[in-house]
From Swiss-Prot:
Role this protein plays: Required for the formation of DNA double-strand breaks together with narya and vilya during the meiotic recombination process. Plays a redundant role with narya in chromosome segregation during female meiosis.
Originating organism: Drosophila melanogaster
Alphabetic keyword roster: Chromosome partition, Meiosis, Metal-binding, Zinc, Zinc-finger
Protein name in the entry: RING finger protein nenya
Gene coding for it: nenya
Classification via InterPro entries: Zip3/RNF212-like (IPR042123), Znf_RING (IPR001841), Znf_RING/FYVE/PHD (IPR013083), Znf_RING_CS (IPR017907)
Phylogenetic placement of the source organism: Eukaryota, Metazoa, Ecdysozoa, Arthropoda, Hexapoda
């Protein structure tokens, strides 16, 4: 801390406590005597600028009083301020880094969901095609059943592929393409058509085939 003194005549405040000192707007210190001498031309005797001054006492404005305080106090204060602001910047950077990590995770999850959606859409399209095949297959056999139904009471008429038209492919009952052949359909039989032998004898299965004649159909 410096000793308050007049920058023109160098009189010190600690030597003359009753002497009033002033601080000018140009940051010079003048005693009352030197200030009164310069009041005629209203110029600072040191820098010749316009003279405006206030007395140095306890009523100094805060922005002027801090010029007369120990700078070490400001050094410690600014050190705390600097540390506080550095911590806040580090916290902000950490928050931004975590947000970027979360954004990358969400982006990865979104890509996975998009792949799943594409797979589901592809599977749905396959199922729609399979349903269309099933409907065509059912419609074909329903129409053939209506055509052949009058022959149940009348004279049998041999089936003709030309009259029946092109038979649709037997659709798979599962999502995998396990198409049943015509040979498999000709050996199709119901559980009630299985003849069982006596319990003490080995069981033999006799499969009855359905050749298309309505008279031969039994349950």
């Amino acid at each position: 801390m410096f000793r308050i003194h007049c920058n023109k005549c160098f009189r010190r405040r600690n030597v003359e406590p009753t002497l009033i000192f002033h601080m000018t707007q140009c940051q010079h210190v003048l005693c009352a005597s030197c200030l009164s001498e310069s009041s005629t031309d209203k110029k600072c005797p040191l820098c010749k600028r316009d003279l405006r001054a206030i007395p140095i006492d306890k009523n100094l404005p805060p922005n002027v009083a801090q010029y007369f305080e120990d700078p070490l106090r400001f050094q410690q204060l600014y050190r705390k301020i600097s540390k506080f602001q550095a911590d806040q910047r580090a916290s902000d950077n950490l928050g931004f880094y975590r947000q970027m990590q979360e954004h990358e995770k969400n982006e990865s999850r979104l890509k996975g969901f998009c792949k799943m959606e594409a797979q589901f859409n592809q599977q749905i399209q396959k199922e729609k095609e399979r349903i269309a095949e099933l409907r065509a297959y059912i419609k074909y056999h329903e129409e053939e059943g209506l055509k052949e139904w009058p022959h149940a009471t009348g004279v049998e008429k041999p089936w003709s592929n030309q009259a029946r038209g092109l038979r649709p492919r037997t659709p798979s009952v599962t999502t995998s393409d396990n198409t049943q052949s015509d040979e498999h359909m000709t050996t199709f039989c119901l559980d009630s058509d299985i003849d069982c032998l006596e319990e003490d004898e080995p069981r033999r299965y006799v499969k009855k085939t359905f050749n298309g004649n309505i008279k031969d159909f039994h349950i």
